[in-house]
Amino acid sequence: MIQSGIGHLRAIQMRSVASEVVYKRLGGEPLAVRAVVGRTVFRSTDADGIWTRVETRDFIVPKEQLPFEPQVGDEVEFLGATYEVLAPNGEPAWRWSDAFHTAYRIHAKHTGG
């Protein structure tokens, strides 16, 4: 029941709040997908006790729209700006957006445009 509810909500999300983005795999062809745009704040402490805060632009893309796992170095174009997929502070470059693995939450940083 929860899984079907998540599927239903994901469909509403894609119709209502998702934006068109272009995903470019490193060395691959551009792929137009719909993504919900968000952010994640990562915090860590280095060996000297200094706090680091990194904020990423996140793109939540349904798994069926992206036929491969996102990789560090891939790029996302959104509203004329380019974002590079990255792994901040040793974190993974992406996470599953939910417990049923229906969408990638891809972490990226603005690099130009």
Predicted regions and their residues:
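Short, conserved turn/kink motifs that form compact alpha/beta structural patches or helix kinks used as
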Residues: 25-113
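Active-site-proximal polar cores
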Residues: 1-25, 29
